Amino acid sequence: MLNRDLLKIERDAVRQATGVLTAANDATESNEQRDTRAHELLADIVDSIPEGSRLDDNSFEAVIQAGINDLYYLGPIEELLPDTSISEIMVNAPDDVWVERAGMLRKVPVTFEDDEHVKFIINR
């Protein structure tokens, strides 16, 4: 999960990458090829952002993966999907995400940047 500073870097990179990746969309490439292409582009963009160029390797990769999740998957909630104990995910607000496990609701530390980020994921 990204903190607010990393989330801002990620969202800036995704905004810049969206047009480039949409224009270069190739329906014949596999998801792995598409993700690799997005990873390379996002890495270049994050490196060009002053705050991004100062990230340690773990934070850098977390920002890139979050960007790929935003571009092609379910954004910040993607990391919850492998957890088979979760039966429902509810996004009430950018910083108000809940899961249901064994009939119990629990708030999780998953955060979207803002309402526009939530809408971006929904409308994709």
Range-by-range predicted roles:
Residues 12-124:
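N-terminal "pre-motor" subdomain/linker immediately upstream of P-loop NTPase catalytic cores
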Residues 1-4:
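Short, charge/polar-rich alpha-helical segments
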Residues 6-9:
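Long, compositionally biased regulatory regions of eukaryotic proteins
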